[in-house]
Amino acid sequence: MLSLDGIIVVWFFLLGTCIGSFLNVVVYRLPRGESLIRPASRCPSCNHPIRPWDNIPVLSWIILRGRCRDCGSNISGRYPISEAIMGFWFIGCSLLAFNAAPTTKISSWILTVFLALFGTALFASTQIVQAGSKVPRVLCWLLLFALAGTLFALFSIMST
């Protein structure tokens, strides 16, 4: 049986992998000026929409052995790796924040949110640059906002 702490760690990992999955969409579509919402994710080879049960972060890639269910073409290992990295990032953010401010839960949650947001924006920016595109301005503003929020949360924790 998992303890409450174990459940929280699993929850943060799952949340992080879902955010990581969405980041894969952001990295691909944002530099191209495409919508982040529509159309639904598709196989780049056969253009077939990805079924919801084939879009479960990390797990679906493992079950499908890194291939499209419809055409059998390879799906890059970058996708589940990005999802797992974000899952572990979210775990790290929560552990750091709750150990930094064990007595002030609201400050811990605020720090967790801003740390996770900063890491998410930084990871997406890094992936976009690695793909050879320019980082969109909205992502730069998100990075600055998340950094300011992280610093504010840290200073408020340190002053209590």
Which role fits each region the language model picked out?
Residues 1-160:
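A membrane-topology feature that recognizes alpha-helical transmembrane segments
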